[in-house]
Amino acid sequence: MIRIEHIKKKFKKVIALEDISASFEKGQVISLIGPNGSGKTTLIKSILGMVKPGSGKIFFNNEPINGDPSYRARIGYMPQIGRYPDNMKVGQLFTMLKNIRNVPANQTDEELIERFRLKEIFGKPMRTLSGGTRQKVSAALAFLFDPEVLILDEPTAGLDPLSSEILKEKILQEKSRNKLILITSHILSDLDELTTHIMYLHEGRLEFFKQIEELREETGELKLGKAIARIMKGEKFSSGWIDKMFILEGPSGEVKQENKVY
């Protein structure tokens, strides 16, 4: 469905993506993981046409995306930080996008609007919303037009536990409908029950792209965080690399620390 061929991208002297090739198909949930600055967001924005690669090609349903933005209507995108007009009310935002897309009401997916109880804040300006509430708005917008492909950048960041579970349930529901879903997250426990494939980037390079079951079999670990830590042993990373890279959870699920690599 989406095919990437030898994508390269530099920002001045910084290599963001170095010769990335991969294919993503319907029914897959691809988890893009790696340290900060590894190229995850650049890859996502390249697929969306928001960043133009220096070289290489990207195909959507076997058609090159260059010069034809129409394919984007078939993708639901949830950015890590949603940016919306400050003075626009929440309800106006949804109405505006429905009018732009001209999609009949019976063809929209408003489940997250209902489950997040967003109609209760339709009269509030976007500037008054907390970070977590803005995340709920972004999530509801990503799913609103029942897209074939979902691209979710740190989707549970800033969400309370209940809202996080609601969103994960929705992702699983769309997975069961054979949609292609790409997710980035530093909270690996969020990905255990969702993902089918792991795509690991480091310094703009693709280190591995594996089915999660293959990864578990190779490492003997059921938990994604532990599996990745094992498979990376013997590489150039330090022994504390996995701790530095990801949010760790204690035995009862509480967040212990968050150290990021830049």
Question: What do the PLM-derived regions correspond to, one by one?
Answer:
Residues 33-35:
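The feature captures the beta-strand-to-loop junction immediately N-terminal to the Walker
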Residues 125-132:
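Conserved ABC ATPase signature
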Residues 95, 106-121:
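Conserved ABC ATPase "signature" region
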Residues 56-71:
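Conserved ABC transporter NBD signature motif
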